[in-house]
């Protein structure tokens, strides 16, 4: 899918890799970068920062609210025209609590934003894409959606759900012989602030620019799935062939992944939102 002359909508686009991908899309000739975010100040700052690259429109949208999403979609189309590329990038992790300490509100908020929100956004736009037989949906999930990890059980569940949904819709479109494409992206921890305090002794925490560049390239090439780094493509293979105790020993003790969240602090804004929801 080409970015040139495309209207590109990115949820969570006011910061992190969402904002970086928006800039990259404009650099590649996108007609308009449409930001959906809940942070008005962040939206305005991103518009000022990226305005020199091209047209940027921003809307305050709670993507976990289906009615709000539908109204915001209608407004975006009125202002910018049909959406060609949507990147579901909004996400949250509330804490590093073990599951027995997680509140029902934390569970609900995590599942709503990480799993249901990309479904809501895509459901609003997909019928029009199918009618035009044109468009691309990219869902940013997580390597945590393929690899179980202590102290992030609900986050992992939300991303497992997102991966299963995203890839299932991809196959539905394939069976329809549609030209609308789906890309599922599963990156490792990214150094954007969302995973402050994470420790990863073997696999380095990923740089946002690197991840954004890989995602943009995956969309351009209509890739079905992209693990970042590439080695994460093989996680499921090793899970199937290795005994569980060997798999746990390697990823938990050798790679240190099962202890990555032990000192997690996260982004203060996410913690505040979680406490307000509790």
Where are the regions that the model predicts?
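C-terminal helical subdomain
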Residues: 184, 200-236
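Canonical Rossmann dinucleotide-binding motif of NAD(H)/NADP(H)-dependent dehydrogenases/reductases
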Residues: 2-34
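Substrate-binding pocket helix/loop in short-chain dehydrogenase/reductase
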Residues: 97-99, 103-109
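The beta1-alpha1 cofactor-binding region of Rossmann-like NAD(H)/NADP(H)-dependent oxidoreductases
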Residues: 40-41, 60-71, 104
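Active-site helix of classical SDR
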Residues: 122, 158
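Conserved glycine-rich Rossmann-like NAD(P)H-binding loop of the short-chain dehydrogenase/reductase
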Residues: 30-45
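Residue(s) in the substrate-gating loop at a strand-loop-helix junction
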Residues: 142
């Amino acid at each position: 899918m080409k970015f040139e002359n495309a209207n590109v909508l990115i949820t969570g686009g006011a910061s992190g890799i969402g904002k970086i991908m928006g800039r990259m899309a404009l650099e590649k000739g996108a007609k308009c970068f449409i930001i959906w975010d809940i942070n008005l100040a962040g939206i305005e700052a991103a518009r000022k920062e990226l305005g020199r690259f091209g047209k940027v429109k921003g809307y305050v949208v709670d993507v976990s609210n289906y009615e709000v999403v539908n109204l915001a979609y209608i407004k975006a189309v009125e202002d910018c025209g049909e959406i060609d590329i949507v990147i579901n990038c909004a996400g949250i992790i509330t804490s590093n609590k073990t599951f027995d300490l997680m509140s029902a509100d934390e569970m609900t908020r995590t599942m709503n934003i990480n799993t249901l929100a990309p479904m809501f956004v895509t459901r609003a736009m997909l019928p029009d894409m199918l009618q035009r037989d044109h468009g691309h949906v990219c869902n940013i999930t997580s390597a945590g959606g393929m690899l179980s990890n202590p102290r992030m059980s609900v986050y992992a569940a939300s991303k497992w759900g997102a991966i299963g949904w995203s890839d299932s819709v991809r196959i539905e479109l394939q069976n329809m012989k549609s030209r609308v494409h789906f890309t599922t992206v599963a990156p490792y921890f990214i150094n954007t602030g969302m995973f402050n305090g994470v420790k990863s002794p073997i696999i380095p925490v990923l740089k946002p620019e690197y991840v954004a560049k890989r995602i943009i390239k995956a969309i351009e090439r209509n890739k079905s799935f992209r693990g970042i780094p590439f080695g994460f493509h093989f996680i499921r293979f090793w899970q199937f062939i290795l005994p569980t105790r060997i798999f746990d020993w390697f990823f938990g003790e050798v790679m240190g992944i099962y202890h990555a969240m032990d000192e997690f602090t996260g982004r203060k804004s996410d913690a505040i939102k979680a406490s307000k929801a509790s």
